Regions:
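Functionally engaged cysteine thiol sites
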Residues: 1-7, 96, 106
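Glycine-rich phosphate/pyrophosphate-binding loop and the adjoining helix
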Residues: 88-145
Length: 145
């Protein structure tokens, strides 16, 4: 921003406006998207202000956006539904296939250490996550050789 020379929002904005589609990944903390996501959305309110408050063209109307979240025990689906509405309000296209949440249990009280340990194992079993990450790292490093 003009008043904060260390602000790097322009980097996010440039990539966003050059994209046909954007998928944001985040975690669910205490029933909501995490603080990093919240800060990003707060900083991007200027997008919505352009067409709502200032009557200018919606500069994101042709961009598909989605949000994928991972959480342990509470409110993941509801949080994603809310954030989809936020993206619609911003003026993005919001195809249902780009909004998804993984939640290990629906028991809000499950804060046990054993539950968190089992959560990670179950996630890996369901999505083969560790193997995919290892393969991706190898492919990425080979790309730069």
């Amino acid at each position: 921003s003009y008043n904060n020379p260390d602000d790097e929002l322009w980097k996010v904005t440039n990539e966003l406006l050059l994209s046909d589609a954007v998928v944001i990944f985040g975690s669910i903390r205490w029933g909501k998207m995490n603080a990093v996501y919240a800060k990003l959305m707060e900083r991007l309110t200027w997008i919505e202000n352009r067409h709502t408050a200032l009557g200018e063209k919606n500069i994101v109307e042709n961009i598909d956006i989605g949000i994928i979240s991972v959480g342990h025990n509470w409110n993941g689906e509801e949080a994603i539904k809310l954030e989809k509405k936020v993206m619609e309000f911003f003026g993005f296209k919001t195809p249902n296939d780009l909004f998804w949440s993984y939640q290990w249990t629906k028991k809000a009280e499950d804060e046990s250490l054993s539950g968190y340990k089992k959560d990670g194992k179950d996630f890996d079993d369901e999505f083969d996550f560790i193997r995919i990450v290892k393969e991706s790292i190898i492919k990425f490093s080979q790309f730069f050789k």
